[in-house]
């Protein structure tokens, strides 16, 4: 995805500790044209699967998941980071946020994640794989099946992909960051 890579290099900001800030176009202010391109690419990569539901975790995964769901004409469900009083048949798990350095209990209603679902998980970042592992747990609890995981940006210098692939997960990342040393963004050629 050349458009995405160009945007990361142009507008992404690097901070110590392996943090890449893309809040000007992905996860605070969003670029709808870029989001559409991201959705189109996820559709291209997962069109041959039997996916019938798109899943994400709030909040930064919602925009790319909605775009992908819209383009595939599929429902989108997201795991919530706070359990509303109105949720019924809740499935829950604990997820550690790398960026915020805290744990969240994430929940989803079993009414919206069932054994009949073939799930594509879409999110903004893959770092250590914490959110993805939490989603795997929710999918297992529900009896649904995972067809794959799509990430806008992957940090290859962290071990999220390795952990997921060891569990048999298909991982597709649209931009892979090889290194952020000295606040220089190095993107892998794909």
Curated annotation (Swiss-Prot):
It comes from the Bacteria. Transmembrane segments: none annotated. CDD domains: PRTases_typeI. GO terms for biological process: purine ribonucleoside salvage; xanthine metabolic process; XMP salvage. GO terms for cellular component: cytoplasm. It catalyses: XMP + diphosphate = xanthine + 5-phospho-alpha-D-ribose 1-diphosphate. The keyword Ligase does not apply. The keyword Magnesium does not apply. Gene3D superfamilies: 3.40.50.2020. Its EC number is 2.4.2.22. Keywords: Cytoplasm, Glycosyltransferase, Purine salvage, Transferase. SUPFAM superfamilies: PRTase-like. It is an enzyme of class 2 (transferase). Pathway: Purine metabolism; XMP biosynthesis via salvage pathway; XMP from xanthine: step 1/1. Its main location: cytoplasm. It is found in: Cytoplasm. Xanthine binds at residues 20, 27, 155. One of its GO terms (molecular function) is xanthine phosphoribosyltransferase activity. 5-phospho-alpha-D-ribose 1-diphosphate binds at residues 127-131. Belongs to the purine/pyrimidine phosphoribosyltransferase family. Xpt subfamily. Homodimer. Converts the preformed base xanthine, a product of nucleic acid breakdown, to xanthosine 5'-monophosphate (XMP), so it can be reused for RNA or DNA synthesis. This is Xanthine phosphoribosyltransferase. It comes from Bacteroides thetaiotaomicron (strain ATCC 29148 / DSM 2079 / JCM 5827 / CCUG 10774 / NCTC 10582 / VPI-5482 / E50). The lineage of its organism: Bacteria, Pseudomonadati, Bacteroidota, Bacteroidia, Bacteroidales. The gene is xpt.
């Amino acid at each position: 995805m050349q458009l995405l890579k160009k945007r990361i290099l142009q507008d992404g900001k690097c901070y110590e500790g392996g943090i890449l800030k893309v809040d000007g176009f992905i996860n605070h202010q969003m670029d709808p044209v870029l989001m559409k391109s991201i959705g189109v690419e996820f559709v291209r990569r997962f069109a041959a699967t039997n996916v019938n539901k798109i899943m994400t975790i709030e909040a930064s995964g919602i925009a790319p998941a909605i775009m992908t769901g819209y383009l595939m004409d599929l429902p989108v469900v997201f795991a919530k980071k706070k359990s509303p009083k109105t949720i019924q048949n809740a499935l829950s798990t604990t997820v550690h946020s790398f960026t915020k350095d805290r744990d969240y209990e994430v929940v989803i209603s079993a009414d919206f994640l069932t054994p009949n679902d073939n799930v594509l998980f879409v999110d903004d970042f893959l770092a250590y794989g914490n959110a993805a592992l939490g989603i795997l747990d929710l999918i297992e609890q529900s009896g649904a099946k995972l067809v794959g995981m799509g990430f806008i940006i992957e940090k290859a210098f962290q071990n999220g992909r390795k952990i997921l692939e060891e569990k048999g997960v298909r991982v597709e990342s649209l931009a892979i960051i090889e290194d952020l040393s000295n606040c220089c963004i190095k993107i892998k050629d794909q």
